[in-house]
Amino acid sequence: MGSLVEKQILTRFVKIAAVLIILLFNNVYALELKMPIANNIDSFHSQLAIRFAAQVKKETNNRVIITVLAKDSGYKDEEIFGAVKNDLVAMGSRLLSSLDHESQLFQLDALPFLATSYRDAFNLYKVSKAELEQVLKIKEVKLLYAVPWPSQGLYTRNKIETLDDLKGLSFRPYSKLTDLFGKSLGLEPVIVPLDKLARAISRKQLDVVFGSAASSNEFGLSRVFSYWYNLDAWLPKEIVFISMKQWLTLSSEDQAIVLSVAQRIESEGWQSSKQASDNAKAQLEFSNVKLEEPSVQLRQEFKLKSLLVVEQWLENIGDHGRDVWERYMKL
Protein backbone atom coordinates (compact mmCIF):
# COMPACT_ATOMS: atom_id res chain seq x y z
CA MET A 1 0.00 0.00 0.00
CA GLY A 2 2.74 2.40 0.97
CA SER A 3 4.61 1.58 -2.20
CA LEU A 4 1.53 2.39 -4.32
CA VAL A 5 1.04 5.75 -2.61
CA GLU A 6 4.70 6.57 -3.09
CA LYS A 7 4.42 5.72 -6.79
CA GLN A 8 1.35 7.95 -7.16
CA ILE A 9 3.12 10.83 -5.42
CA LEU A 10 6.20 10.32 -7.56
CA THR A 11 4.10 10.22 -10.75
CA ARG A 12 2.29 13.42 -9.77
CA PHE A 13 5.62 15.08 -8.94
CA VAL A 14 7.05 14.09 -12.33
CA LYS A 15 4.01 15.53 -14.14
CA ILE A 16 4.21 18.80 -12.22
CA ALA A 17 7.95 19.02 -12.85
CA ALA A 18 7.39 18.40 -16.55
CA VAL A 19 4.81 21.21 -16.74
CA LEU A 20 7.15 23.57 -14.89
CA ILE A 21 10.02 22.70 -17.21
CA ILE A 22 7.84 23.38 -20.26
CA LEU A 23 6.71 26.72 -18.84
CA LEU A 24 10.27 27.64 -17.95
CA PHE A 25 11.46 26.65 -21.41
CA ASN A 26 8.80 28.78 -23.08
CA ASN A 27 9.62 31.78 -20.90
CA VAL A 28 13.35 31.48 -21.41
CA TYR A 29 13.09 31.11 -25.18
CA ALA A 30 10.22 33.55 -25.82
CA LEU A 31 11.18 36.33 -28.20
CA GLU A 32 9.82 39.60 -26.83
CA LEU A 33 9.39 42.33 -29.45
CA LYS A 34 8.51 45.97 -28.81
CA MET A 35 6.29 47.68 -31.39
CA PRO A 36 5.81 51.48 -31.10
CA ILE A 37 2.96 52.95 -33.13
CA ALA A 38 2.23 56.55 -34.06
CA ASN A 39 -1.54 56.54 -33.57
CA ASN A 40 -3.84 56.89 -30.59
CA ILE A 41 -4.57 53.56 -28.97
CA ASP A 42 -8.27 53.69 -29.88
CA SER A 43 -7.72 54.20 -33.63
CA PHE A 44 -8.65 51.25 -35.80
CA HIS A 45 -5.02 50.87 -36.91
CA SER A 46 -3.89 50.57 -33.29
CA GLN A 47 -6.61 48.04 -32.53
CA LEU A 48 -5.52 45.99 -35.53
CA ALA A 49 -1.94 46.01 -34.22
CA ILE A 50 -3.13 44.83 -30.81
CA ARG A 51 -5.12 41.97 -32.36
CA PHE A 52 -2.12 41.05 -34.51
CA ALA A 53 0.10 40.85 -31.42
CA ALA A 54 -2.44 38.80 -29.48
CA GLN A 55 -2.92 36.32 -32.31
CA VAL A 56 0.82 35.89 -32.86
CA LYS A 57 1.31 35.20 -29.17
CA LYS A 58 -1.48 32.63 -29.17
CA GLU A 59 -0.49 30.80 -32.35
CA THR A 60 3.21 30.62 -31.45
CA ASN A 61 2.36 29.31 -27.97
CA ASN A 62 4.02 32.33 -26.35
CA ARG A 63 7.25 31.89 -28.32
CA VAL A 64 6.78 35.33 -29.91
CA ILE A 65 5.42 38.08 -27.67
CA ILE A 66 4.76 41.47 -29.29
CA THR A 67 4.15 44.46 -27.02
CA VAL A 68 2.34 47.30 -28.78
CA LEU A 69 3.51 50.67 -27.47
CA ALA A 70 0.92 53.37 -28.00
CA LYS A 71 1.56 56.92 -29.15
CA ASP A 72 3.80 58.97 -26.83
CA SER A 73 5.38 55.82 -25.36
CA GLY A 74 8.96 56.85 -26.07
CA TYR A 75 9.35 57.02 -29.85
CA LYS A 76 8.11 59.98 -31.85
CA ASP A 77 6.25 59.29 -35.06
CA GLU A 78 9.15 60.33 -37.28
CA GLU A 79 11.65 58.25 -35.26
CA ILE A 80 9.96 54.86 -35.50
CA PHE A 81 11.14 53.68 -38.92
CA GLY A 82 14.75 54.70 -38.30
CA ALA A 83 14.71 52.95 -34.93
CA VAL A 84 13.51 49.71 -36.54
CA LYS A 85 15.90 50.04 -39.48
CA ASN A 86 18.81 50.40 -37.05
CA ASP A 87 17.48 47.60 -34.81
CA LEU A 88 16.97 49.93 -31.85
CA VAL A 89 13.46 48.57 -31.57
CA ALA A 90 12.10 45.40 -33.15
CA MET A 91 8.93 46.50 -34.91
CA GLY A 92 6.90 49.55 -35.79
CA SER A 93 4.03 51.12 -37.67
CA ARG A 94 4.21 54.16 -39.96
CA LEU A 95 2.36 55.96 -42.71
CA LEU A 96 4.11 54.74 -45.84
CA SER A 97 4.08 58.04 -47.73
CA SER A 98 5.65 59.84 -44.77
CA LEU A 99 8.76 57.72 -45.39
CA ASP A 100 9.35 59.29 -48.80
CA HIS A 101 12.77 60.49 -47.65
CA GLU A 102 13.72 56.80 -47.69
CA SER A 103 12.42 56.16 -51.21
CA GLN A 104 10.27 58.02 -53.72
CA LEU A 105 8.44 54.75 -54.36
CA PHE A 106 6.82 55.17 -50.94
CA GLN A 107 4.95 58.19 -52.36
CA LEU A 108 2.98 56.02 -54.77
CA ASP A 109 -0.21 55.61 -52.73
CA ALA A 110 -0.31 59.35 -51.98
CA LEU A 111 -0.27 60.47 -55.61
CA PRO A 112 -3.42 62.61 -55.75
CA PHE A 113 -6.37 61.11 -57.63
CA LEU A 114 -4.42 58.07 -58.82
CA ALA A 115 -6.27 55.53 -56.66
CA THR A 116 -9.49 57.00 -55.28
CA SER A 117 -11.43 53.92 -54.13
CA TYR A 118 -10.66 50.87 -52.00
CA ARG A 119 -10.69 48.71 -55.10
CA ASP A 120 -8.22 50.98 -56.90
CA ALA A 121 -6.06 51.29 -53.78
CA PHE A 122 -5.89 47.51 -53.41
CA ASN A 123 -4.97 47.08 -57.08
CA LEU A 124 -2.23 49.67 -56.63
CA TYR A 125 -0.97 47.77 -53.59
CA LYS A 126 -0.94 44.47 -55.48
CA VAL A 127 1.12 45.79 -58.39
CA SER A 128 3.58 47.63 -56.14
CA LYS A 129 3.95 45.22 -53.20
CA ALA A 130 6.95 43.28 -54.55
CA GLU A 131 8.86 46.51 -55.23
CA LEU A 132 7.95 47.93 -51.81
CA GLU A 133 9.17 44.75 -50.12
CA GLN A 134 12.43 44.88 -52.06
CA VAL A 135 13.12 48.51 -51.12
CA LEU A 136 12.37 47.76 -47.46
CA LYS A 137 14.58 44.66 -47.55
CA ILE A 138 17.52 46.75 -48.75
CA LYS A 139 16.93 48.93 -45.69
CA GLU A 140 17.00 45.84 -43.42
CA VAL A 141 13.25 45.98 -42.79
CA LYS A 142 10.55 43.42 -43.60
CA LEU A 143 6.98 44.38 -44.46
CA LEU A 144 4.36 42.42 -42.51
CA TYR A 145 1.11 44.05 -43.54
CA ALA A 146 -0.35 47.25 -44.98
CA VAL A 147 -3.80 48.77 -44.39
CA PRO A 148 -5.09 52.06 -45.81
CA TRP A 149 -6.57 55.00 -44.02
CA PRO A 150 -9.95 56.02 -45.45
CA SER A 151 -9.84 58.30 -48.47
CA GLN A 152 -8.44 61.76 -47.94
CA GLY A 153 -10.59 64.85 -47.96
CA LEU A 154 -10.10 68.46 -46.93
CA TYR A 155 -11.15 70.10 -43.66
CA THR A 156 -11.90 73.82 -43.97
CA ARG A 157 -13.41 76.54 -41.81
CA ASN A 158 -15.27 78.16 -44.69
CA LYS A 159 -17.09 76.95 -47.76
CA ILE A 160 -14.85 76.42 -50.81
CA GLU A 161 -16.23 77.19 -54.25
CA THR A 162 -13.03 77.38 -56.34
CA LEU A 163 -9.30 76.98 -55.79
CA ASP A 164 -9.06 80.75 -55.44
CA ASP A 165 -10.69 80.30 -52.02
CA LEU A 166 -7.65 78.27 -50.90
CA LYS A 167 -4.92 80.71 -51.89
CA GLY A 168 -2.71 81.76 -49.01
CA LEU A 169 -4.35 79.43 -46.46
CA SER A 170 -2.05 77.46 -44.15
CA PHE A 171 -1.89 73.65 -44.13
CA ARG A 172 0.31 70.90 -42.72
CA PRO A 173 2.02 68.70 -45.32
CA TYR A 174 2.70 65.20 -43.97
CA SER A 175 4.96 64.18 -46.85
CA LYS A 176 6.92 65.76 -49.67
CA LEU A 177 4.10 64.87 -52.01
CA THR A 178 1.36 66.53 -49.96
CA ASP A 179 3.66 69.54 -49.68
CA LEU A 180 3.95 69.71 -53.46
CA PHE A 181 0.22 69.17 -54.00
CA GLY A 182 -0.75 71.75 -51.39
CA LYS A 183 1.55 74.36 -52.89
CA SER A 184 0.10 73.68 -56.34
CA LEU A 185 -3.31 74.57 -54.88
CA GLY A 186 -1.99 77.87 -53.54
CA LEU A 187 -1.74 76.71 -49.92
CA GLU A 188 1.05 77.79 -47.57
CA PRO A 189 2.85 74.92 -45.76
CA VAL A 190 3.36 75.00 -41.99
CA ILE A 191 5.64 72.37 -40.46
CA VAL A 192 3.99 70.76 -37.43
CA PRO A 193 5.27 67.49 -35.88
CA LEU A 194 2.56 64.86 -35.57
CA ASP A 195 2.71 64.88 -31.77
CA LYS A 196 2.02 68.65 -31.84
CA LEU A 197 -0.74 68.52 -34.45
CA ALA A 198 -3.74 68.37 -32.11
CA ARG A 199 -2.46 71.41 -30.22
CA ALA A 200 -1.79 73.34 -33.44
CA ILE A 201 -5.31 72.59 -34.61
CA SER A 202 -6.89 73.63 -31.31
CA ARG A 203 -4.95 76.91 -31.50
CA LYS A 204 -6.21 77.43 -35.06
CA GLN A 205 -2.70 77.58 -36.49
CA LEU A 206 -3.89 75.71 -39.59
CA ASP A 207 -6.57 76.98 -41.96
CA VAL A 208 -7.16 73.68 -43.76
CA VAL A 209 -6.13 70.06 -43.15
CA PHE A 210 -5.87 67.13 -45.55
CA GLY A 211 -7.26 64.09 -43.80
CA SER A 212 -9.87 61.37 -43.79
CA ALA A 213 -13.13 61.54 -41.91
CA ALA A 214 -11.50 59.16 -39.41
CA SER A 215 -8.80 61.74 -38.61
CA SER A 216 -11.26 63.96 -36.78
CA ASN A 217 -11.39 62.06 -33.50
CA GLU A 218 -7.63 61.66 -33.34
CA PHE A 219 -6.87 65.37 -33.70
CA GLY A 220 -10.05 67.17 -32.61
CA LEU A 221 -10.77 68.46 -36.11
CA SER A 222 -14.53 68.71 -35.63
CA ARG A 223 -14.04 71.28 -32.86
CA VAL A 224 -12.30 73.69 -35.25
CA PHE A 225 -13.42 73.03 -38.82
CA SER A 226 -16.95 73.48 -40.14
CA TYR A 227 -16.59 71.61 -43.44
CA TRP A 228 -15.12 68.37 -44.70
CA TYR A 229 -14.85 68.00 -48.47
CA ASN A 230 -15.08 64.41 -49.64
CA LEU A 231 -12.36 64.59 -52.28
CA ASP A 232 -11.54 60.85 -52.44
CA ALA A 233 -8.07 62.13 -53.28
CA TRP A 234 -5.95 59.15 -52.16
CA LEU A 235 -5.90 56.32 -49.61
CA PRO A 236 -2.51 56.34 -47.84
CA LYS A 237 -1.42 53.07 -46.26
CA GLU A 238 -0.15 52.46 -42.77
CA ILE A 239 2.47 49.70 -42.79
CA VAL A 240 3.63 47.37 -40.02
CA PHE A 241 7.19 46.11 -40.26
CA ILE A 242 9.96 44.30 -38.39
CA SER A 243 13.73 44.71 -38.46
CA MET A 244 15.33 42.04 -40.61
CA LYS A 245 17.72 41.15 -37.80
CA GLN A 246 14.83 40.34 -35.47
CA TRP A 247 12.98 38.54 -38.24
CA LEU A 248 15.88 36.19 -38.82
CA THR A 249 15.96 35.22 -35.14
CA LEU A 250 12.54 33.60 -35.60
CA SER A 251 12.36 29.94 -36.49
CA SER A 252 10.96 29.11 -39.93
CA GLU A 253 7.84 27.78 -38.19
CA ASP A 254 7.27 31.04 -36.32
CA GLN A 255 8.01 33.12 -39.41
CA ALA A 256 5.27 31.23 -41.24
CA ILE A 257 2.85 31.80 -38.37
CA VAL A 258 3.61 35.53 -38.19
CA LEU A 259 3.10 35.93 -41.94
CA SER A 260 -0.14 33.96 -41.81
CA VAL A 261 -1.48 36.15 -39.01
CA ALA A 262 -0.30 39.28 -40.82
CA GLN A 263 -2.15 38.24 -43.96
CA ARG A 264 -5.39 37.73 -42.02
CA ILE A 265 -5.00 41.03 -40.17
CA GLU A 266 -4.32 42.82 -43.45
CA SER A 267 -7.51 41.42 -44.99
CA GLU A 268 -9.47 42.32 -41.87
CA GLY A 269 -7.88 45.76 -41.85
CA TRP A 270 -9.06 46.71 -45.32
CA GLN A 271 -12.60 45.90 -44.22
CA SER A 272 -12.10 47.76 -40.93
CA SER A 273 -10.94 50.82 -42.86
CA LYS A 274 -14.17 50.90 -44.86
CA GLN A 275 -16.21 50.58 -41.69
CA ALA A 276 -14.14 53.25 -39.95
CA SER A 277 -14.79 55.58 -42.88
CA ASP A 278 -18.56 55.10 -42.72
CA ASN A 279 -18.64 55.49 -38.93
CA ALA A 280 -16.42 58.58 -39.03
CA LYS A 281 -18.60 60.32 -41.61
CA ALA A 282 -21.65 59.74 -39.44
CA GLN A 283 -19.73 61.06 -36.43
CA LEU A 284 -18.72 64.20 -38.33
CA GLU A 285 -22.34 64.94 -39.15
CA PHE A 286 -23.28 64.36 -35.52
CA SER A 287 -20.57 66.89 -34.58
CA ASN A 288 -22.17 69.46 -36.91
CA VAL A 289 -19.42 69.29 -39.51
CA LYS A 290 -20.91 69.70 -42.97
CA LEU A 291 -19.95 66.90 -45.34
CA GLU A 292 -19.60 68.44 -48.78
CA GLU A 293 -19.13 66.93 -52.20
CA PRO A 294 -16.97 69.30 -54.25
CA SER A 295 -18.68 70.84 -57.24
CA VAL A 296 -17.88 69.44 -60.67
CA GLN A 297 -15.78 72.53 -61.34
CA LEU A 298 -13.88 72.31 -58.05
CA ARG A 299 -13.16 68.59 -58.45
CA GLN A 300 -11.90 69.23 -61.96
CA GLU A 301 -9.60 71.98 -60.68
CA PHE A 302 -8.18 69.62 -58.05
CA LYS A 303 -7.59 66.92 -60.67
CA LEU A 304 -5.86 69.29 -63.06
CA LYS A 305 -3.42 70.30 -60.32
CA SER A 306 -2.87 66.66 -59.42
CA LEU A 307 -1.75 65.87 -62.97
CA LEU A 308 1.18 68.24 -62.54
CA VAL A 309 2.18 66.42 -59.34
CA VAL A 310 1.95 63.00 -61.00
CA GLU A 311 3.94 64.19 -64.02
CA GLN A 312 6.71 65.52 -61.79
CA TRP A 313 6.76 62.26 -59.81
CA LEU A 314 7.08 60.23 -63.00
CA GLU A 315 10.00 62.40 -64.12
CA ASN A 316 11.85 61.90 -60.84
CA ILE A 317 11.08 58.29 -59.92
CA GLY A 318 13.05 56.46 -62.60
CA ASP A 319 12.24 53.32 -64.57
CA HIS A 320 11.27 51.07 -61.64
CA GLY A 321 8.61 53.52 -60.44
CA ARG A 322 7.28 54.23 -63.92
CA ASP A 323 7.00 50.49 -64.53
CA VAL A 324 4.80 50.08 -61.43
CA TRP A 325 2.67 53.05 -62.46
CA GLU A 326 2.23 51.69 -65.99
CA ARG A 327 1.21 48.24 -64.71
CA TYR A 328 -1.41 49.86 -62.49
CA MET A 329 -2.78 52.06 -65.28
CA LYS A 330 -3.29 48.96 -67.47
CA LEU A 331 -5.57 47.28 -64.92
Where are the regions that the model predicts?
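Bacterial N-terminal signal peptides that target proteins for export
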Residues: S3-A17
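A composition/secondary-structure signal for short, hydrophobic, low-basic-content segments
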Residues: L4, I22-L23, A30
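Bacterial N-terminal signal peptides
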Residues: K15-N26
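N-terminal secretory/targeting leader peptides
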Residues: L31-D120, S128-L132, L136-L331
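Short beta-strand-centered segments that line the small-molecule binding cleft or hinge
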Residues: N123
